[in-house]
Amino acid sequence: MNSTAAAINPNPNVIPFDDTYILYDSHDFLSFLSAYFSLMPILVLAFYLSWFIITRELEACIVAFGQLMNEIFNNVIKNIIKQPRPVSFGASFQNDTIRSGYGMPSAHSQFMGFCFTYNSLKIYTSWKNLNFLEKCIFSGALALLSFCVCFSRVYLHYHNLDQVIVGFSVGALTGSLYFFIVGIIRELGLINWFLKLRIVRLFYMTDSYNLAPLTLKENYEAYWKRINQRSFNDKSKRD
């Protein structure tokens, strides 16, 4: 049996891709569900990428860069504290990778703490077209999603409760600080200066999400306005 396995995978340096390699109890539905919630940070980053590709919004790059810096900061803290995880996942777990195998603070929880805080502040300060209740609903949805991710890390025994609480708290702190720094950069006019660079203009990048965020209804109405205007212009040319 062992010789067969060695023949299939003879390379001793092959290890699991830890970002998507999640162990769960196959007889426990909640454990199965928690495995999917543990993938949420990857899905969020995929959303940022697709958001930028489709809309060319600079905000997608700004928040993704902040999340990346937050992730690096998490690695630094882990290698300083060096607190082990509550359960060992084997010698190959995050061994010889750029990520730390330590448990304090939880990277997933810190990611969601940053995501929740930064985007909640954005909702309350920039989304002028929403009333207070609507803002609370959006922020509450982010809070619920963050809770599910944090819970999954404890339930799957990747972290203990303290590691998750500290991780989320550190993420919330860095998210708030990053939001403040981005605000200062905007006030200084550096965002507009960046968007006016020739190489940036080639990508048609904008900052409309910050200046004038639109609702789905406004986007829909603007779409039909363009369609009707185009039809009118075509008709005028034929006449």
Curated annotation (Swiss-Prot):
Its main location: endoplasmic reticulum. Keywords: Endoplasmic reticulum, Hydrolase, Membrane, Transmembrane, Transmembrane helix. It is a multi-pass membrane protein. Pfam families: PAP2. Pathway: Protein modification; protein glycosylation. GO terms for cellular component: endoplasmic reticulum; endoplasmic reticulum membrane. The keyword Membrane applies. Its EC number is 3.6.1.43. InterPro entries: Dolichyldiphosphatase_PAP2 (IPR039667), P_Acid_Pase_2/haloperoxi_sf (IPR036938), P_Acid_Pase_2/haloperoxidase (IPR000326). This is Dolichyldiphosphatase. It comes from Saccharomyces cerevisiae (strain ATCC 204508 / S288c).
